[in-house]
Amino acid sequence: MALVLHAGSGNKNAFKALIAAEYSGVKVELVKNFQMGVSNKTPEFLKMNPIGKIPVLETPDGPVFESNAIARYVTRSKADNPLYGSSLIEYAHIEQWNDFSATEVDANIGKWLYPRLGIAPYVAVSEEAAIAALKRSLGALNTHLASNTYLVGHSVTLADIVMTCNLYMGFARIMTKSFTSEFPHVERYFWTMVNQPNFKKVLGDVKQAESVPPVQKKAPPPKEQKPKEAKKEAPKEAPKPKAVEKPEEEEEAPKPKPKNPLDLLPPSKMILDEWKRLYSNTKTNFREVAIKGFWDMYDPEGYSLWFCDYKYNDENTVSFVTMNKVGGFLQRMDLCRKYAFGKMLVIGSEPPFKVKGLWLFRGPEIPKFVMDEVYDMELYEWTKVDISDEAQKERVSAMIEDLEPFEGESLLDAKCFK
């Protein structure tokens, strides 16, 4: 039997298998008249995928679901398929980029797009985090593509098919030219791929989104219509106030943003903005004025101090790349600027360079929304400062001051988040 793909004709996850089939010379038939919400709810479909998601591929040996698994199956249907590379390391790199495409590109495009389409709840802070994470991912992809035409090797592989299909949704639905122009190598790569004959057979002519979709507002529920009653003559009563019926504008007004949990903490004697002003305005006698002022202000009940150490210092072999890495981290921390102060040090005169930091956060722990939204956090070891330990307290002071040498080594760079 031929391979049969169950999905809508415009489904970008189905495109992966269809493009792989074009390159591989494998026949895959797309079912006709597939209707999302109907076709995928039938008993026959649910036998193939019990949770009703698409796409699903029918094969002689049984069904396969999950789009990357389907694309792999189609690719492996042809022996020695060049879409899987020519060596073990190329195969590993193809799978590496497939994972990156799913978790770093597709996921973040979805987190930005779906709430705007009304498919998921819209939360402004979450959108900002999704855009920041997507920019980080596209930045990494852009760097790789600066010196590579394809993701792996010197011809199209399955990695390019999966990446292009995931980028397709972003370019077509939400990533405008003003957004993608920051990543010129990604742009060049995407337009090169979608204009390859085997891609174009499936995708057709691709046009870039001209604007970001507006946030979809939920339509107010239809008002109940009461059955008409025969008119009765009755003495006129004084007009009653209308019951709880808001004017149109009020119904459509956006709901107030939910408060950040940190705003609900008990008041602290430490006013973070006052400390930031003191830090910025102290030009001389820094230890006597700013450092002393910090410890006078510090409230261990309302704030916590944390050391961070980069886990992969062996990778820090190029000075400007290391400094850019730290700068990118600080940009992504922007969502907590109201609640944090930080110092990041790049240490050493020769590579590999060490990256260490000190952070002051509102509350007794690192805020959960920071851990959830700033992906760099997991690249560091975090240790809570014990201010009863004089050595740790002095280390805090030295890091705030940019004291050099620091722990016996020179400072290549020091950055402040305030």
From Swiss-Prot:
> Where would you find the membrane-spanning parts of this chain?
none
Pfam hit, one: GST_C
Q: Which UniProt keywords apply?
A: Elongation factor, Protein biosynthesis
Q: One GO molecular function term?
A: translation elongation factor activity
Q: Does the keyword Protein biosynthesis apply?
A: yes
Q: What does this protein do?
A: Probably plays a role in anchoring the complex to other cellular components.
From the UniProt entry, list the residue stretches annotated as the region Disordered. Answer: 210-265
Organism taxonomic ancestry: Eukaryota, Viridiplantae, Streptophyta, Embryophyta, Tracheophyta
Note the Gene3D superfamilies from the entry: 1.20.1050.10, Glutaredoxin, Translation elongation factor EF1B, gamma chain, conserved domain
What range(s) does the GST N-terminal domain occupy?
1-82
| Quaternary organization | EF-1 is composed of four subunits: alpha, beta, delta, and gamma.
This one is known as Elongation factor 1-gamma 2
Biased region (Basic and acidic residues) positions are 221-246
